Amino acid sequence: MKSTPAFAIVSLAFAAALVHAQIVVKNQGFVPFADAPIRYRSENLADPVAKLQKQFDRGAIALEYEPGRGYLPSVLRTLGIAVNSQTLVFSKTSFQYPKISPEKPRALYFNDDVYVGQVRDGMALEFVSFDPMQGAIFYILDDRHVEHPRFERAELDCLQCHVAATTTKGVPGVLLRSVVTTPSGAQAGGTPSYVTGHDSPFHERWGGWYVTGTSGKQTHMGRAVGTLDTSPFLAATSDIVAHLVLAHQTQMHNLITQTNYQTRLALYAEDARNKALNLPAGTISETGRQRFERPAEALVRYLLFADETPLQDRVEGGSGFAREFAAKGPRDAQGRSLRDFDLRKRIFKYPCSYLIYSEAFDAIPGPAKDYIYRRLFEVLSGREQGPEFASLSGGDRKAILEILAATKAGLPEEWKQSIQAVNRKP
């Protein structure tokens, strides 16, 4: 069968087996997370879906079932996920792949902490929900009408696809992968694949996706909605701005989790070393420090969009996603927010990821977070003038520093003292 010149997504994908037939994950170069100190299978979780299930268990809230829509509208409302975050993909990358095609794409929705997938006429909704300490947690929800709907954790099945050294930074995570597809939406054999982030070439993105909105002279591999019947979906759009945000956010989430895991593993090993050598508690060797400073440095670069692929023309979505996303703030006294879009030369007006406000970022262990804050301050204050951050102008750095000082809780005192000193100068 002839392949279409398109790229498809492998995003939030689940392997064919369900939670009742889990498979042991083979070691493919990823971070050890099953045992101490990570203990990924722990039931002590604080991700949004886990919190929601606890509310169900207490009888505090209930999901509403809508004929033809299932639990999806109620789930999105309860989790605070906007309908206009919808993106439509027709690659066969869900465990429900037989039901996915260009005529019946899968719908994906997201906010800062949760990703939701629905397949038309499918048997389950698919979730990736981010726990502050454990990162991506995978769930399914039976989408048939039952008296007591319940989120079921589906971990090792999902991890067959969702843990890889080169695509999810070696931790349980999320990814957008572009692959050449056949006309049915299946991946064509022997074809390349690309992981999509904000640093991906524009022309390699979004094949296998439906994309609505405009990108000017910039070309991409996405497909216009055209004759697709969008009436079964919650929205008629697959907004290009939502696609841009999704590409950034997925890899940012993975870097946060990687830094968290590597720091915990390093501190765990250092604690054992200190006890064996009778060293003072809290001593960190140079080797141990390098173990978490390497991913932390990568996080800083990505957080500040250091390698972002520049936009060559204006991008417009048209669904209202950009407006609603930006309205979430927070804003400083001048009305500036890290959620403000540029969409002419780059994604955001102030290039520092809004995920710096997330619980997952705040949960990064102290030594790594101290390093991140130190490096951020060096870059934003202008002390760091290396080529790695050349994309940030002096005005960008000053604005981001001021926005964070005004809106981000828990910053080192050095930040505020420095800004106050600058403001006192005549």
Which stretches of residues belong to each language-model region?
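Boundary at the C-terminal end of the N-terminal hydrophobic targeting segment
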Residues: V19-A21
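N-terminal alpha-helical interaction blocks
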Residues: V24-G122, S129
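Positively charged n-region of N-terminal signal peptides that target proteins for export
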Residues: M1-A6
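Mature extracytoplasmic or organellar-lumen-exposed domains after removal of signal/transit peptides
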Residues: D271, L277-I284, L304, E308-K345, ...
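Sequence context surrounding c-type heme c attachment/ligation sites in exported
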Residues: I23, G117-Q290, A296-L304, I347-K425
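Bacterial N-terminal signal peptides
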Residues: A8-A17
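A short, ordered amphipathic alpha-helix with a cationic face
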Residues: A62, L343-F348
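Short glycine-rich, low-complexity/disordered patches
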Residues: N84-K92, S193, P310-G317
